Amino acid sequence: MSGFSLESEFYCCKCGTKGIPIARKKGKAREAGHLKKLYCLKCGEETNHAECKEFTHYNKADFEFERQYGNFDENQNRILDYGLFRNKMHNEGVDLPWARRNYL
């Protein structure tokens, strides 16, 4: 299985548009939520894109939540680590999209 690869979806942290998916060899995979500089076709520039993987601790719903509540700065970098951001939102009484997955 040396050729086995996993595909990740990437979403632009500036505009939220889905970017081009990237296949990575299993041993070279990054954690879900990883930020990668990619060219965004909608923005017309290189921006940070969040790596989303279904059935992990960070998928599209988590990205949209993080973007909606402003955890990315003007350079599309995270203001708070995602775990800290998630706990902050929970403590503020915000309805978390992953609560149904029992992560808290």
Say what each PLM segment does.
Residues M1-E9, G27, A50-L104:
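Short, intrinsically disordered terminal segments enriched in charged and Pro/Gly residues
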Residues S5-Y11, G33-K36:
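Short metal-coordination and nucleic-acid-contact micro-motifs, chiefly zinc-binding Cys/His arrays
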Residues C12-C15, C40-C43:
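Short cysteine-rich clusters marking metal-coordination/redox-active sites
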Residues T17-G19, T47:
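Cys/His-rich microdomains that often coordinate metals
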Residues K25-K37:
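Short linker/helix segments within small regulatory modules
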Residues G33-H34, C43-G44, K60-F63:
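Short, surface-exposed linear patches
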Residues K42-T47, C52:
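Intrinsically disordered, low-complexity glycine/proline-rich and charged
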